C-alpha cells in the first residue's frame, strides 16, 4: 500500500503499526512518526515477549522522523534503552480531550445516596478490577451505602481478559454493578461521584482519567506512569499503590467522607488541568507544527540537492 500511495509522511499508532509500519516506511524511504500510546500488555511482565518487542522497537524506530510518547516515563525508558534519540522524541498530551464536549454537570454534586463510584475499562485483570471489587466489598461491610459501577467491553481474545463466569460471580456476591459497554460514557460520568482506576497495566495516558477530569470529577488512580501525569494526590484526586485493595479501600472511603464542596474543588482542579494541558486543541497544534516542520525541512533539502 505504501509503495502504491507513496505518502509524504506517515503517522503510525500502537505497537504493531509502529513496528511493522515503520519498517515498511523505512524500506521505501518514506518518513514516518510513531505514536507510542503506552507500552501495553507485552511490557507488563519481564519475559521473552518484552525482550522481543524491545528488539523490534529498536530495529524499527531508529530511522523514524519522530517518535511521540504519551507520558514522560515511557520516553525516558526508550532513551535509556537507546531505542530513540533525543532529537526524535516528543511528549504529547495523550490523545487529547475535547473539554467542550466533556463538561461538568455541577447540579449532581450535592449529597446523594448512594455515593457512586465508577470504573470504566477494558475487562482485563491488569486494569485492577479485582482490587476494585475487594475495596467495594470492604466499603459494604463497613456499612457505607455505595454503588460501585463497572463499565467496559470484554476482550475475550486477550490473554489477560477476565472471564464472564468471574464477572457473574462478582455481581452475585459483591456490590458490583456491571453496566456493560456503552458508547455514551458521558451519561454515566454525569451521574457518578468519583472515577476509580486501580490499573497496573502499562498505560500511556488513560482516556478515562481525562474524560472524568474534564467533566469535573475527582479521581482515584494508581501511582503508576501515565496516571500520575494526570492525577496529583490531594489536588484533583488520590493516588494509591498498585495491587493493594486495602489502600484502595481507604482512598475510596476518604473520598466519600469528603464534603461535597471538597470533592467539587478537586473536580475543578482536574478540569482546569485538562483545559491547560490536555485539550485536544493543544494536540492538534503539535500535529500541525510537526507537519509544517517536515514540509520546511523537505523544501530545504530539495534546495540543497538541486
Question: Could you describe each region identified by the protein language model?
Answer:
Residues 152, 161-181:
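Nucleotide-activated donor-binding/catalytic signature segment of Leloir-type glycosyltransferases, i.e.
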Residues 12-18, 36:
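Short His-centered aromatic/hydrophobic patch
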Residues 218-221, 231:
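Short hydrophobic beta-strand element within catalytic cores of glycosyltransferases
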Residues 247, 254, 261-277, 283-289:
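A short, well-ordered alpha-helix in the C-terminal region of glycosyltransferases
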Residues 58-104:
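Donor nucleotide-sugar binding/catalytic pocket of nucleotide-sugar-dependent glycosyltransferases
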Residues 232-234, 238-245, 254-260:
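Conserved acidic donor-binding segment of nucleotide-sugar-dependent glycosyltransferases
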Residues 120, 147-162:
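Glycosyltransferase donor-sugar binding loop
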Residues 108-127, 133-136, 149-151:
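Conserved donor-binding/catalytic core segment of Leloir-type glycosyltransferases
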